[in-house]
From Swiss-Prot:
One GO biological process term: translation
Protein name: Large ribosomal subunit protein uL22m
Keywords: Mitochondrion, Ribonucleoprotein, Ribosomal protein, Transit peptide
Protein location: Mitochondrion
Gene3D superfamilies: Ribosomal protein L22/L17
Family: Belongs to the universal ribosomal protein uL22 family.
Protein's UniProt keywords contain Isomerase: no
Length: 233
């Protein structure tokens, strides 16, 4: 039996090349309509729900365009001004949507640049060691370019940040493998960054101006004198 198997293997090895060519020609002559269909190959060997996976994120986030109302303020048409009125300062609203960053972390950066001039904000953001600082800086630069090209701003350095805030974007929920067959929930958060640049010099106090000691004393005295004794004459 072993001799027969050995002889068959030798005959297979010594077969002429024409037989192989004939076999390949026969296989190529089969029409594609009746050719055997191979099972579709999987695009990825493992399934991961990370937002950076690409395939799943693109499908889930296909029609998520982000907020649209903020950019509509650029289309506002103001009424003409009188000759004795103070000229209205030019402004531009800009945004960046679906940033892969937590809105809670981005809030610190957005609040940091409020009330600064554009040049000062760009300088300060170079030293902010946070991932979201890059997106904020790029958004401010884009808004600065739009203000010069489309909104008749003469000097690009004559702008200050009038508004800077963050909105919550889409949250992708996934799972993470833990030990002993357990799993943990994971949230991949996104955010939207909004900025409004205004022409002119920034104000000295963006927020409410702090009171002087004399003003604090006057407000305290007024508060004390306005007290009322209950059930008195």
């Amino acid at each position: 039996m072993h001799k027969v198997i050995r002889q068959m293997s030798q005959l297979r090895l010594q077969a002429p090349q024409g037989a192989a060519l004939l076999r390949s020609a026969d296989s190529s002559s089969i029409s594609p309509a009746i050719s055997p269909v191979s099972p579709p190959a999987l695009q990825s060997k493992s399934l991961h729900t990370a937002a950076s996976a690409g395939m799943l994120c693109a499908k889930w986030n296909k029609y998520n365009y982000g907020p649209r109302k903020w950019l509509e303020y650029n289309k506002t048409v103001h009424p003409p001004q009188e000759t004795d009125e103070e000229p209205r300062n030019a402004y531009v609203c800009h945004m960046r949507s679906n940033i892969k960053y937590s809105p809670d972390k981005m809030w610190y950066i957005a609040a940091f640049v409020r009330g600064m001039s554009v040049d000062e904000a760009l300088k300060q953001l170079n030293f902010v060691l946070k991932k979201g600082a890059t997106d904020v800086k790029e958004t401010i630069l884009e808004a600065q370019q739009i203000a010069v090209e489309r909104h008749n701003v003469e000097y690009k350095s004559n702008l200050w940040i009038a508004e800077s805030f963050v909105g919550k974007g889409r949250v992708f929920k996934g799972v993470r493998r833990h030990a002993r067959g357990r799993f943990g929930k994971v949230e991949y958060k996104h955010c939207h960054y909004f900025v409004r640049l205004e022409e002119g010099e920034p104000p000295q106090h963006y927020y409410q101006e702090p009171q002087t000691p004399e003003q604090q004393y006057e407000s305290w005295m007024e508060q004390m004198r306005s007290r009322k004794i209950i059930n008195s004459l």
